[in-house]
């Protein structure tokens, strides 16, 4: 069981709501994934037009919403988006995203740390999306973040665990849950993230852009479960050379 703040999650697969062909496919894929925490961008919600098309189906599915501040270019804009989410959606959970560069969507470490400090002081449950920087993740812990969400590779790239070496350090040092976010493009990559000891993964593009999102969601669900079980069972140590599994010459003496 995974615990973030005071909430327990049976599923360690978190999902998103973007890039699906329509809301029905989105809902069926999320249901198939068994995800219990689903992120939604505040910039996608038109509060003047009502919440039915996107949010009502998610609430009916019983998932917890994790609004995100995607589109914010600095700490001020991110704090505004978080406060709007709390007011309009009734949640103090927030996925903090600040990426002013529209090409690569790399998170701004300085603005993210400042926004995290402000939001934690305001009573938010903050889960920041950041580069795989062990020092930054420690600083975010210190200001009160409930979890950290280091990227595996650029958002939507499906490149996999490009930052694996740094993710290992973050997982080793973290005192809060580590959710690997962004760039996971295949179930095998999600399984690998879990084998490293990540507490959860967040997957959106790889599911939504699949030719069969519902089947792909099921695949990710199973991969995350297997990866976590493998981590808990204990993976064998990687050796630099061959190690025989049985005596090589004993039978010659019989």
UniProtKB/Swiss-Prot annotation:
Catalytic residues (positions): 95 (schiff-base intermediate with dxp)
Binding site for 1-deoxy-D-xylulose 5-phosphate: 156, 182-183, 204-205
Catalytic activity: [ThiS sulfur-carrier protein]-C-terminal-Gly-aminoethanethioate + 2-iminoacetate + 1-deoxy-D-xylulose 5-phosphate = [ThiS sulfur-carrier protein]-C-terminal Gly-Gly + 2-[(2R,5Z)-2-carboxy-4-methylthiazol-5(2H)-ylidene]ethyl phosphate + 2 H2O + H(+)
Record GO cellular component, one term: cytoplasm
Function description: Catalyzes the rearrangement of 1-deoxy-D-xylulose 5-phosphate (DXP) to produce the thiazole phosphate moiety of thiamine. Sulfur is provided by the thiocarboxylate moiety of the carrier protein ThiS. In vitro, sulfur can be provided by H(2)S.
Protein name in the entry: Thiazole synthase
Alphabetized GO MF terms: thiazole synthase activity
Gene: thiG
Species the sequence originates in: Shewanella baltica (strain OS155 / ATCC BAA-1091)
InterPro entries: Aldolase_TIM, Thiazole_synthase_ThiG, ThiG
Location, primary (coarse class): cytoplasm
Family: Belongs to the ThiG family.
SUPFAM superfamilies xref list: ThiG-like
Keywords, comma-separated and alphabetical: Cytoplasm, Schiff base, Thiamine biosynthesis, Transferase
GO BP, sorted A to Z: thiamine diphosphate biosynthetic process
Metabolic or biological pathway, per its Swiss-Prot or TrEMBL entry: Cofactor biosynthesis; thiamine diphosphate biosynthesis
Subunit organization: Homotetramer. Forms heterodimers with either ThiH or ThiS.
Assigned EC number: 2.8.1.10
Keyword Cytoplasm attributed: yes
Cell location: Cytoplasm
Acyltransferase keyword on record: no
EC main group: transferase
